[in-house]
UniProtKB/Swiss-Prot annotation:
Lineage of origin: Eukaryota, Amoebozoa, Evosea, Eumycetozoa, Dictyostelia
Bilayer disposition of the protein: Single-pass membrane protein
Places the protein is found: Membrane
Listed name of the protein: Uncharacterized protein DDB_G0277605
Glycosylated residues, chain numbering: N82, N149
Top-level taxonomic group: Eukaryota
Region spans: Disordered: 1-37
Entry's transmembrane regions: 116-136
Keyword terms of this UniProt record: Glycoprotein, Membrane, Transmembrane, Transmembrane helix
Gene Ontology CC: membrane
Record organism: Dictyostelium discoideum
Chief site of localization: membrane
Compositionally skewed regions (Low complexity) per UniProt: 12-37
Length: 154
């Protein structure tokens, strides 16, 4: 009892805070151990901060341009649970390839509209030129025919 009287009130408060901190630290350590056990037991596939869920197996369908109605299905690389962790089975090159493919498809789609318009114009010009040539030759033949008739009449 004498010891309690000698100690100031703040001592008991500080002591309680220390005990609470120790309990919190123990709980945090237990939680971390559970997470590590899950990772080691393959219940949870570890994803680094540089990867997103899309990188490891999300299939995304999206519109390339808001003003166009073209959809491109971008297939991301999927790692199944039974596959090994070798670099050949899973790396970011597959993801980069899918991005490159979708960019090529995007430029192709944009060029496709332009190609159709240009092709239509070229075909119409060719038809006009061919009709012009036909009419010109027709005029030449008519003139020759008329000249022949005129020479016979004389």
């Amino acid at each position: 009892m004498d010891n309690l009287k000698e100690k100031p009130l703040s001592y008991n408060i500080n002591n309680n805070n220390l005990n609470n901190n120790n309990n919190n630290n123990n709980n945090n350590n237990n939680n971390n151990n559970n997470i590590n056990n899950n990772i080691n037991n393959n219940n949870f596939k570890y994803v680094s901060f540089s990867e997103s869920l899309e990188d490891i197996g999300y299939q995304n369908q999206y519109i390339i341009d808001k003003d166009e109605d073209y959809y491109i299905q971008e297939q991301r690389y999927i790692r199944q649970n039974n596959q090994s962790d070798d670099e050949e089975d899973f790396n970011n090159n597959n993801y980069e390839d899918s991005i490159k493919i979708s960019l090529i498809q995007k430029s192709f789609i944009k060029n496709k509209k332009n190609k159709i318009i240009i092709t239509t114009i070229v075909v119409l010009l060719m038809i006009a030129v061919s009709l012009g040539l036909i009419l010109a030759w027709q005029g030449v033949f008519d003139q020759i025919h008329n000249n022949n008739n005129n020479s016979k009449d004389e």
